């Protein structure tokens, strides 16, 4: 008798599980995530992918492309979503690829992302440097010369990144092009050189953003300091105001990151659209994960493990997102 009860219970569980799986909104639908070539974006992308899998979707490995290509792929429907839309940094690319007519963007995935220019604290204190405009002085600029040409060397952005245009625009607006060189290339490799210079006690001058591992390695306020700018200046926005409530101006507004999806796809998939709108990830959690990657735990398997760990530590929140998304399908 006991065996038959156990069998009946197991059979009922199997049937309900199969029925539930068949009822999931994503059954039979494949999702193609897209991100940039920055591997530190994989963590947040995979977190969204995991939640989509719980809705029944088959989610492919993220494609890694330049941001411009990513937005074009999303607009055409070749890609389904990206978890790394920066506002306002990517606004020009977003609009150029079709804007709100082509894209679905609701909610805020990550709040409080910062970016700007930093120098080592030792040099800042010694020469009383607080503002990037001080580098108009050739004597000050020369402190950050790494190749002997007399100009300050700024560790800057990869070609094609949103920050590239902003930096070039600001160097021109602040009349720094004669005394500052914007060095571009592989950002991670350039920053590794910059950090080596710092460890040798040499002055450093670089652009960075959070969330990213750099500020775990060179801590603002302790090792390095943010430089202010003389006035707000962003490309394509004459009315840009990057001044903070306390009057400080670091040249960039505090950014937000969003999940952006192909609009037509999102309209046909209300559960996924709801998920994209409600997921939220603290910037500190991304910084912490990026730091672990920088310490050597950066393989595909490692990052999957970081996602597992985050979900386990926030299971109730994660399940809440999934359940709320499922309710939107009904």
UniProtKB/Swiss-Prot annotation:
Signal peptide: 1-21
MF (Gene Ontology): quaternary ammonium group binding; transmembrane transporter activity
Recorded name of the encoding gene: proX
Job of this protein: Part of the ProU ABC transporter complex involved in glycine betaine and proline betaine uptake. Binds glycine betaine and proline betaine with high affinity.
Induction field: By cold shock in a PNPase-dependent fashion.
GO CC annotations, alphabetized: membrane; outer membrane-bounded periplasmic space; ProVWX complex
Disulfide bonds: 157-163
BP GO annotations: amino acid import across plasma membrane; cellular response to osmotic stress; glycine betaine transport; glycine import across plasma membrane; hyperosmotic response
Protein name as catalogued: Glycine betaine/proline betaine-binding periplasmic protein
Any Pfam family: OpuAC
Sites where the protein binds substrate: 86, 90, 161-163
Alphabetical keyword list: Amino-acid transport, Disulfide bond, Periplasm, Signal, Transport
Classification lineage: Bacteria, Pseudomonadati, Pseudomonadota, Gammaproteobacteria, Enterobacterales
Subunit structure and binding partners: The complex is composed of two ATP-binding proteins (ProV), two transmembrane proteins (ProW) and a solute-binding protein (ProX).
Subcellular localization: Periplasm
Source species: Escherichia coli (strain K12)
